[in-house]
C-alpha cells in the first residue's frame, strides 16, 4: 500500500509504502522530499524501522543544472557535475568515480553534433584511468570504440575495444569484433562475429575468434554450428537461441516471455501484472529452484525479503544497511558503495552494454540500471517491454514503437549509437543529454496516462523546457513542447496538462479539464500560443502515406502540411515539411526537433518534390 502527501505545487512531500505478505513481517518505509523555491529537489530522506537517514542532498548551479549530489548525508560520498556552454555534461567527479566526456575536444576525432568523441573514467579503488575513442559513420552509428588507458587513452590500447565493422541497409549489425581479457595478464580478440540475417531476423552467428574470455567473463558463446540457430514467431519474438542452449521461448499477449526452456531441461518462468510489470521469476536448474518475487520496491528471494530498492540504491534487509549506486552519464551503475563509502562493486562496460571480465557481481542492476539475468548464461538485460542481448547488440523482440522507426531495424539498440542514447523501457530512444539519469527512476518518473506515458519533470535537465521523448503510445518521435514561464499546456490527444514552474521547468502533470482552444496544437493558460507538435502517427494525423525510401508521411489535421522524419538531420533538421499540390508534395520548410521551422535554410533538388505516384497508403 502506498500513501502520498503532496505540496501545494503538486510535488510529493512524503511517500509511505507499507509492505505486507502472508507470514512475513510488515515493513513500513517513508520517503520525505524537500524542494527549493523553484521546486527543484534538494533532499531525499528515508525512514525505515523508525530510523531516518538522508539518502541524498542535491545542489544546483545558477542555470538550474545539477551541480552536486551527496549520498547518505556524507560529503565523502559526493559527486560534482560539470557542463559546457551548450549545457552538455562534460564531467562527473568524486572520490570513488570520475568520468570525463569530450565532444569537439579531447583525444578522439572532434564531433560537433553532440555525439561523444571520447571519454575517460576511473572507478572504485582502482588507480587506472580507462577510456574510449569513438568513431561513427555518416548516419551517426557507432563504428569503432577503441579502448586505452591513461588520460591520453594511449596505453594498453585495444584491451577492451568493440568495433562494428559492417551494418546492413536496415541498420542490423553484420560483423562485430570485441576484445577482452583472455588470461590473468593477457588480452586479445574474444569475439569476431558474423551475423547471418533473413531481413531483420537473425538466423545464425559465427565466431571466428580463437580465444575466450578469462574466467567465464562476458562474450558471445558460439554454442552450435547450424543454418538456423535462432527462430522467431509471427510477432517477431525470439523463440529459440541454440547458442545459449535455449530450445523454446513462449510469450504472453504482451509479447513478454512466459517461459524460457533450455535443452538440458532447465527453465526460467516469468509472472507479470496486467500492465506488464514483472512480478516473479522462477529459475530451475537441476534440483535447484530460485524464486524471486518483485513486490513494489521489495525483492524477495525464496520467500525471504532480500532487497529494498531506494531512490539511490538499495537496502539489504538482512542487516538494514544502505548501499548506493555511483552512475555515469547514461545511468549505468559504475560503482556500488555502502553507507560508509566502502567500495563493494566496480563495473566497466563495453559501449553496447557488456561488462568487462574484471567487473563485480554483488548485485544484478548494471547497464542503464537494468537487471542483468546471468543465470544459465542467459545474459539478458530486462528493459521492461523487451529484453536486450548485449553480446549481439540486439533486442530479442520487436520494438513496440516500430512504426515510428521506419528506417531502421526493430531489433537494433538505440539506433546503433549506444553512447549518446538510451532506451528507458525498451520502447523508445532518448538522447542522454536531455535527461538527468542521476535523478531518473523509471518506476517513479514515468506515469501512464491512458495510451501514453511521459517522464515527469524530476528527470528533466533543461530550462525552457521539454518533455522527455515519449516512452510509449502514439506520440512517436515527438513529445517536445516549448513552454512559457508559469504556463500550462493542454493536449487533446493525451488528455493531460503540464504545469510549468516560475523557472520554466515542468513541475507536474494532471488530468486535462475542458477542451483545448485549438485541437492538435497547444495554448498556454496565459493565451500565449506555442507550437505543439502533433503526433506523427496514424492517430494524430488526418492521413498517412508511405514512401519506399523516405518512410511515412503524416498529414497534419490542423494546417494540412505533410511531415516526415528527416533521416539525414543535416543542419539541425529533424523533420521535412511539405505542402500538398495537385501533382504531389512540394518541400516547404525544414523543422527542428521542437517543431520550429528553420529560417533561411535552402533545399537541394533531391527530395524537393515527391510525386503522388511515389506514395502509397
Regions found by a protein language model. Name each.
Residues 545-576:
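Amphipathic, interaction-prone secondary-structure segments
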Residues 579-617:
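Active-site or metal-binding loop neighborhoods of secreted/extracellular toxin and effector enzymes
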